[in-house]
Amino acid sequence: MSQSYNNIDGLLLLDKPFGITSFDAVYKIKKVLNVEKTGHCGTLDPASTGLLLVLMGKATKLQAKFMKKDKVYLSSFLLGMVTDSGDLDGKVISENSVLNINIEKIKKMVEMFEGEIFQIPPMYSALKYNGKKLCELARQGIEVERKPRKVTIKKFEVLSYDGDIVKVRIECSSGTYIRTLAQDLGNVLKCGATVKTLRREKIDIFDIKDALRFKDTDSADKIIKKLIPL
């Protein structure tokens, strides 16, 4: 009979790997610890990696609080391509030349996205419309009108530009869609853009460098040692 950790209340910093859902990552921990209450703060798509805050026990009551915290992402955008999902998992809509694009032009254009901006949420998202997730409607070929949402981009740093790949670091408010930011940057550059890679590095004061590697979640002891009491 497996040991139960239902009396555990705390926060775990987890480094979610590529290819699994945030739900499955949390479920793995729930199963290993045999803990009843678990949750996470901010979904990462299967193709995205990085920091996932996993809450256990009474700490799950703090989910809404942590969901509102600022985040930092490291991402690479593929210029010259537009997809229906805003990332490489989607259907290619158009491909365009990037011959007239250089890093100086990119750096100048990202300045217009710093501060408070409005974003139209992507169809491929977990937001709901009349009770149905937008991503479910998108898979059926249905597109509905979405209201713009105000978000804050505190820092939009261009790290490098090589060929058609621009690497960026973004510090932003909760609710920011990096895929939408990539698409909007592609629009002002007049070449289109889509997210190639996305990694979440920070949520508020919590940093990916302090996170538990997913391969270590097989061990209840390693999970417990990384748990932050709340």
Curated annotation (Swiss-Prot):
It comes from Endomicrobium trichonymphae. GO terms for biological process: mRNA pseudouridine synthesis; tRNA pseudouridine synthesis. The gene is truB. Responsible for synthesis of pseudouridine from uracil-55 in the psi GC loop of transfer RNAs. This is tRNA pseudouridine synthase B. Pfam families: TruB_C_2, TruB_N. Its EC number is 5.4.99.25. The lineage of its organism: Bacteria, Pseudomonadati, Elusimicrobiota, Endomicrobiia, Endomicrobiales. The keyword Calcium does not apply. It catalyses: uridine(55) in tRNA = pseudouridine(55) in tRNA.
